[in-house]
Amino acid sequence: MSIKLQLALDFVDLHRALLVAEKAVPAGVDWVEAGTPLIKSEGLDAVRELKRRFPDKTIVADMKVMDAGRIEVEAAAKAGAHLIDVLAAASDATILECVQAGKNYGAKIVVDLIAVPDPVARARQVEALGVDYITVHVPIDEQMRAQDPFATLKAVSEAVSVPVGVAGGINSETAAQAVAHGAAYVIVGGAITKAKDPEAATRELRRALDEGAVIPTDLFKRAGEAEILRVLSMVSAANLSDALHRAGVLEGIRPLFPGIRLVGRALTVRTYPGDWAKPVEAIDAAQPGEVLVIDAGGVGPAIWGELATHSALQKGVAGIVVDGAIRDAGDIMRLQFPVFTRLVMPNAGEPRGFGEIGVPIRIGATRVETGDYLVGDDDGVTVLPQRLAVEYANRAMDVLEKENRIREEIKEGRTLAQVTDLLRWEKKI
């Protein structure tokens, strides 16, 4: 049996969806989906246009029907959809109406198990209601928490006789795994729609499905806790701040020299302005790869210099962030040690021992705790709280992937405003 590849066009702008589809569909896509964001933004005209552009392909309308089943299925079918998605969380009455309307208008019904508490039980129930397909779906927001669909996919595919598909972060590494767990169709979104080359990405996925190949990728996959530092090493401070809803920035903290790069977990220090005792003692307390984050009140005198830097390098400290002042800037630059600071000045204070190591501190409006993650580069430093680390490291990667796609569209001759349809999406007040 040939495994169907479904392309999920989860854009809000039809012109961007069509640009990707025109490149990807000829490379091996079987089913072309107007994603939920696209339908909400552009209406069923998105389905009509996909039907016009790809008359020989199966068109999917991801309506996520929850109520008014007959009305929504009829509308989508008349617009040209062959397959229409309905939520498994909908009532049996709604699903039955969808099934009947689908029969009347020549469309098939796909039930999406997203967020149902017992997917196997609900799959059996909706199969009995007469649906044509069932999709196991890990939603985007759960993907960001490193959830995957494969155990549920296997259980559902073994429990029902209708074709079962899968959606939720599938990429060239995991597509074959989806097939091995029982998928009859595989839904792919970001691994194609965010790829620099959608055609090449589609060909890789097609090969993975047809040959059972595992094709490694650094993108379009979500990391667990053990891989947080790897993910953060790939993203920028700006990517991470965007993921955190433009937050997490240590305002006023700047890199000591250009080209600097810092990724690590925080060991916090609070000290009196100019008192360098606790910062130097923290070097001995630090584990290799940790970053010293020092609250020195945002003022001088300096609490860090060349000799402390030599000690930190020997200990394997990844870098230092100082809300205060450092000195010996030229020597530190020659050592290429990552330093981010508010101030640089020649005068140091005295080691009086006032302060603490490992306590929560605040730099500007941002709280930093020992164990939090930091990403620093030419733009400055962004802090990722450890309690949010898995989800928002993955969201930062999602930001990077989306920017990669936008950059390619700009290179093709359009402006940023044109690619993002900026005027259309300005907030109306």
Language-model-derived ranges and their functions:
Residues 98, 179-182, 190-218, 396:
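C-terminal helical cap(s) of enzyme catalytic domains, especially alpha/beta-barrels
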